[in-house]
Amino acid sequence: WEKDFAQEIADDRMKIVSIHTVFEGHRHQSLSRLKKFVKATGFGHSVGHDRHDVSDEYPNTMILYGTRGTPEVAIIDKEGLIAYQRIGFFDVEEKTQMIRDLMAA
């Protein structure tokens, strides 16, 4: 979507954010490994590392947004409400049109 919406991102009308949520294998999936991965893949958007308090079963973002696993995508509208959320496969072309429709609204 970074390429499809390059102008909207440049005009600060759209943001793409990834959140690395670790719900197992915490020692292996560290913040330092994430930073290396992001640098190696050349992501052009912000990537956050989900905070996990040892007293909680799940990381903070999973608790706050009710995410269930990876990969999971959420499209958040102009009011900050979740317009679409899905775990696993989704139709990219269909969701690209959905984003265009939300931006036009």
Regions found by a protein language model. Give the residues of each.
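Thiol/disulfide oxidoreductase modules built on the thioredoxin-like
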Residues: 41-43, 49-98
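Structural microenvironment flanking redox-active thiols in thiol-disulfide oxidoreductases
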Residues: 1-41, 52-60
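Non-globular targeting/processing and membrane-anchoring segments
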Residues: 98-105
